[in-house]
Amino acid sequence: MSSLELGRYDEGMAILLSIKSLATADWKQLKGAEATYVGIDFGTSTTVVSYSYYDELLDSIKCDVIPIRQKEYDGAMSKSEKLPTVIALYDNQILVGTGASSLKYELEKNKDIWYSFKMELGEDLGPKYYNSTLNREKSIQIQNAKDATSVFFRFLKKEIENFVHTKGLNDNIKYAVSIPASFEANQRRDLIEALSINQIDVSKQALIDEPNAAFLSYILDSDTFGEAITIPNGINPKMLVFDFGAGTCDISILEIGVNRKGVYSKNLSISKFEKLGGDDIDRYIAYNILYPELLVQNGLDSDDFIMSEKRKIVNNLLVFAEKLKIGMCKAINLIWEKYDLSTIAQEYTIVVKDIHIESSKGVLSSSEMQMTSIQFAEVMKVFTRKTGGVIKDGQEYNSIYQSIKSSIKKSGLSTSDIDYVLFIGGSSMNPYVQASLKKWLPNSKLLLPCDTQEHVSKGASIHSLIYNALGLNIVQPITSEPICVVTQNNELLTLVPAGMTMPTDIIEIDNLAVARNG
C-alpha cells in the first residue's frame, strides 16, 4: 500500500484528487532540479517518451512529450511523438520507427524486420530468429527479443540525449520505464538487462506498471482535460484501469481514499499474464477473413499448404488485417453515440489493396480484399465473450473478460463496487470493447484520456520525477500471483500471498526446514 502524508484536511469535505495530495512532500526540493526526469512507455506497437519537470511559477508538475527523429527508408528525416516499435534492415542500414514500419509490407518478419518483440521477452529459447540477417556474423545482432529490445533502446537513448542537449536541459537523465502489470519476473529481467546494456540505469523500483502510470497521468490532466476525481467523505472509490494495447490486456484495480495519514492510493489486484492484445484481433482477421479469401482469389484450397507455410502466409497478412481493424474502428467511432452500437444503421466496408505474398504455389495476389462491419462485429464477439476464450483452427483467442473477472475476484470486490473505469491503450478505443464494458459495468463512470497512447509515458515521467527526485512511490507495485513452494509432502506453502505490496517487510516462516538426505 502507498500511503503518503497529506497534512491537515477538512473533515466532512470531499477531496479533489491530485498528484500533490498523493505525494505530499517538500516540493521546494524540486526547484532547480539537477536532472532531467524521463519516462518511457515501451509499447508493443508504439513507444512514447515524455519528461516531467516542476513549474515553480505554477507550483505544479508539467509533462511534455519528446518528439523523436526518425529516418524514412528513402533517407528523408521526420519527427514524431509516436515511435513505432519496429526495427528494419534495409539497403544496408538499420531503420527504427516510421521508416521501418512502412516496410512491413515488403520485408519478412524476424528476418529483416522485427516488431511485437516486447511480448517475447523472457523466453529462454536462445537464438529464436533463425532466419535473421543480423546474425552472429554481424556487429549488430538480432537473434531474439532481448537483442531486438537492446538495439531499439540504443537508438532511443541516442535520440533522448539529442533532445535533452538541443533543449538545453540537464544532461543527467533519470529514467523510469513503464511495463505491463502482468509482466512476469523473467520478462522484467530481460528488459532491465536490455536497458543496462545501453547504460540506461533503471532500478526495479523505477519500473512502473502501465495501468499505474496511466492513473498518475490522468490525475495530473483531469483538472484541465478530463473528469476530476473526488474522494467523498467516508468513501474509498475503486477504479479499474483497463489497459488494452497491441500486445497486452492489463487490468489494475486501485483504491483511493483518505486515512489518518492523508490521501492514499493502493493496488488491490492486478491481472495475471494472458496472451491477449490488439495483435490477436489482427491474427483472427488474418486467419478467418483474409487467408480464406486469398485462397479463393488464387484458385487454391486450404489443403494446398502445410501449417508452417500457412503461418508464414498469415504473418504477411497481419499488416493488412491491422489496417482493416483500425479503419473500421475509426469509421464507427465517427458516427456512433458513445457506448451504444445500436445507433449504427448502415453497414460499413473497409478495403485493403495490392496484396502480393510469395509461396510454394507462386505469388499469391489480390487486387482488393475487404471486411464489413458485420464481419467485424462477429470478430469482436470472440474477444468480448463472458465465458472465456475460443480455440479455432488450432489458434487460441482469449477474451478481455478473463483478465477483468480474475482481477475483480482477486481484489475481493464485485462489479457493483467499481466506481470508475479508465481506458488506456490504442486497443481500448475499439468501440466494441467500450460498448461491451459499458453494458457489463452500467453504473461505473468511464474515463477517457485525451490521448491514450501518450498517457502512459507521461505517467512514467511523473513517476521518474517523484521517485528519482523525492524517493517516493505513489502507487506501490504488488504481486499478481502468490509465491509458493512445494514441500516434501507435496503440500503447497504460500511464502508471499497475491496482492502483497513490493518491496515488503521481512516475512518470517518458522515451520519450514530443508531436509538433509543421508
Regions found by a protein language model. Name each.
Residues M1-Y129, A206, G277, Y284, ...:
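Early-domain small/polar-rich strand-loop-helix modules and first-structured segments
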Residues A14-A33, T149-K167, Y218-T230, E378, ...:
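Phosphate/ATP-binding catalytic cores across multiple sugar-kinase/actin-like superfamilies
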Residues K79-S178, I400, I404:
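Conserved phosphate-binding loops in N-terminal lobes of ATP-dependent enzymes
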Residues K104-P127, T133-N144, G277-S436:
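Gly/charged contiguous loops adjacent to phosphate- or pyrophosphate-bearing nucleotide/cofactor binding elements
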Residues Q199-A213, Q434-S461:
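Conserved phosphate-binding/catalytic loops in two-lobed NTP-binding clefts
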Residues S2-G12, L16-S18, K31, T44, ...:
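Acidic, glycine/GT-rich loop-and beta-edge segments that sit at the periphery of enzyme/chaperone cores
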Residues Y175-D190, T415-L437, L448-Q453:
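Glycine-rich phosphate-binding loops at beta-strand->alpha-helix junctions
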Residues V49-Y51, L57-D74, S80, L220-L294:
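Glycine-rich phosphate-binding loop of actin/hexokinase-like ATP-binding domains
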